[in-house]
Every structure is written in C-alpha cells, then in structure tokens.
Amino acid sequence: MRYHELNTPAYIVQERKLKENLEILRRVREKAGCKILLAQKAFSMYRVYPLIAEYLNGTTASGIFEAKLAAEEFVRENGPGNLPVEEFVREKAPVAFSVENAFRRNENEAEEKGSLPASRKMPENHVFEPAYKNTEMRELCEICSHLYFNSLAQLEAHRSVWEPYQKAGKINVALRINPEHSTQEGHAIYDPCAPGSRLGIRRSQMSERLPEGVTGLHFHTLCEQGLEPLIETFRSVEENFASYLQEARFINLGVGHHITRPDYNVDGLISFVKEIKEKWQLEVYLEPGEAIALNAGTLITKVLDVIDTEDMPTLILDASAACHMPDVLEMPYTPPLFSAMKSGQEAYEEEQGQCVRKPETADEKGPAARTAETEAGKPTGASEGAWVRLASRTCLAGDVIGLYKLPAVPKVGDILTFGDMAIYSMVKNNTFNGMALPDIVLERDREADDRFELVKRFGYQDFKERLA
C-alpha cells in the first residue's frame, strides 16, 4: 500500500526504527554477556516477532495468553543461542530448559517430539503473575522456560505442579522480590515499591534460604528510567538480599529500562551488568518493553469537525484517547504530535500568562483585538501559531488528547500524526462506544512508495465477538 491509501485511524510501526532499537539491544547483550527479553505487555505486535527474535533471547509474559502468543509466534531460524542455560562459574550447574519439551509452533511439531530442525533455536519464554490460577499452571509449565512467583504462598500452592518439571530440568523457578526502594516520583500507579504494594516479596517475608527448587530472583521497579535508578535499586537489593544472591543462579532486573533512548548511558549499563556477573556469578536478564519499540510507531488520525469554544478551537478526531491511547488519560500525559510547536496545558497557561500586558500607546491593539486573536486560538502576544484542543468523537466529555500549538488551525479532512504510539497502545486499546480499533500497519524498511503493509483491519465483527 501507499501512504495515501491508508485508512484512519491507524497505528503505523516503522520496521527501520525497530531494527535501530534492536541493534542497540543486541550490542548490550553481546558486550555485557547478558540475556535480553521482550516484555510483551508493552508491545505484542506478533507480526514482527520473527524479526525481534533474531536479536533477543526470548520474551516475558504477564499471563497465560501472552505466554501462548510467544510460544506460537516468537520463533526464529537464526538468532542468539539460548538452550541449554549456560554453565556458570560456580560448582553447582544451573537447571537447563529442555528443547524436547520446548513450546511447539503447531500440533504436528508436538506430535513429532524432538524433531525440531537443528537451525531452529527455541527462545526463552518467561512468565510472571501476582497470582496464578490452578487451571493454568500445568499449561504454563509446558510452554514456559522460566516461572516467577510473587509470594512464598503461591510458590507452595503450585509446587505439586511445577516441581516435577523443575526436577526434570524443563523449567526454571524464581521469586519476585520487593527491594522496598522507590525511584518513582509522581507516578505511584506505576511504582511497585509504593507503600502497600502487592508486588514482590519483602525481605522480612523471606525464609532463611531460597526455597527448594528456586534458582532465580527477579525485581521490577523502574518505569521509563535510565541507568542510575537501576544501580540505586540494585544496591538496595545487595544490602537486603545478599545471602539469596549468593544462592541464586540468575537474576532478572525487570522492565522499565529506556535503553534505546538517545540519552541512555548504554556503556554504563554494559559495565554494570558485567559487574553483577563478576561479583555474584549470576546469569543476568533484562526485559525491556518500551525500549524495543520506542519511537517506532505513529498513530494517524483525521479531523472530522472543528468546534469553536470559548478559549480555542476544539478538533474532533476519529482517534480517541480513551479507546486508542489509554495512557494519555491514565498517566496522564500529552502525546507528541508531529508539526506541533508547543503542547500541554502548562505550556498553554505559561504563554497565556506571558501575553497579559497593558497597551503602552493608544495605537496598540486594544482588548477587542486581543480577544479576537484568543478566540481564534492565538493567545495575545503570540507572533505565530494557533492553540487547539484535540478531542475524540466518543461520548466521554474528558476524552481529550491534549492542547497543541500548531502553525495553523487544521481543517476538516486534514491528517494529524501522533508519535511514539507503538508501545502500550495496541495492547491496551478498547472499543468503548463501539469505536473501531485502528488499523495496524507495518512500514517496511525499504525505499518504495508501496512500503506500507496492512497487517490487520478491525471491523464490526471484532467489536461484536467481544460481547455476548
């Protein structure tokens, strides 16, 4: 397809930018000697899983459906070797994940046990949930390589199921710990170390030694952060969980590492991972989510109407914050918009405040002229550009994407493009009000007008089949 043939709204994922991000992650993996996993909760566009699998060691899942998706779709012909788990510089050998019991692409492979092509390297499939259902545990043990427990009670409640797999060398078992050291400011909803958090085992709740069968530790405390918060958190882990680090064979440093952000200290991360490996003789995992598809996707939307309001024009779009980019309302935040000169309530209020002044001469513009400019979306004193409010066509009054200063007020039919829309969008969207989900488009890495591939178009049946 060509760009002008695309429907709106549509998520467009850029293959070239994905590769750029993945090259950075591959460098970290190779230089640091660690393993890197895709956290599917942020980005689950399985059309590009084979590409990602060429660079990363596997995936992490937050539930059985994500684990099954990885088992079915995250496969490769070539890529980093994963199985069995490496021998570490310690006397006790780690538990290996058996290829014979690895997940299968389809029923035919399952019937032909042990017949996987030599070139096909099975990626690792990790899963963590705060609590597991009894009815799902056996299937998880069949398709996953690593199983993480959030409490000692959960570990023991499911021991009768997972222990035979663990003793047979078919699965690795770990505990999620709570370092009780918060590095978040202003986003308690995303802070696993916030007071009252249900996530992770506190030091006071740990037994004297790691429970039988447990060979790994895991913590996840970061959210869109750099290297320093990771180092700070791990120092807390060293201080409070040192004896368990000595027993463990691997540690998973969790999600939230913005490794592919331009200002991230990649060399520092490589050095830090090497330090952990050397000091504690541990296999180290990182499981970034956003970093895989950071700035690798856009959301295009069309202007359907322009409503004049008392402060600025309000544009009604065919995209919705509530339905298509839920984090805009949940965090909240103002998503980047291509061609925007400024954005956000704070920037608007700041500019409005700077524009309040008294005429110095009778020849200067009076109140009427300034009011006319403001009503046109152009605050007093602003030399160029127009402020507009971008909103949706749902019935939710608060379904507002944000305030933006643009070179001019867009017209009905114009296309607007939001940036960084590959992450936490497709995995969280919904059909409230019967809103259609955006198309999913892959922009292939080639110089051609027809480089746009329509991966998925959603329609009425997709809406209806979620209901009863």
Where would I find each of the regions flagged by the language model?
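A charged N-terminal "starter" segment
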Residues: 1-79, 84-103, 109-146, 152-164, ...
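Conserved, mostly hydrophobic/aromatic
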Residues: 18, 41, 70, 175, ...
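General structural feature for long, well-ordered alpha-helical segments within catalytic domains
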Residues: 21-24, 44-48, 55, 66, ...
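Hydrophobic "anchor" residues on beta-strands that sit immediately upstream
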Residues: 37, 172, 250, 283, ...
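Active-site beta-loop-alpha junctions enriched in small/polar residues
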Residues: 39-45, 64-65, 130-132, 150-152, ...
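Hydrophobic residues within beta-strands of alpha/beta enzymes
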Residues: 59-60, 147-148, 217, 251, ...
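Active-site loop/helix belt of alpha/beta enzymes
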Residues: 163, 168, 179-310, 378-380
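Charged (often Lys/Glu-rich) extended helix/loop segments that serve as interaction or gating elements
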Residues: 272, 288-355, 373, 377-468
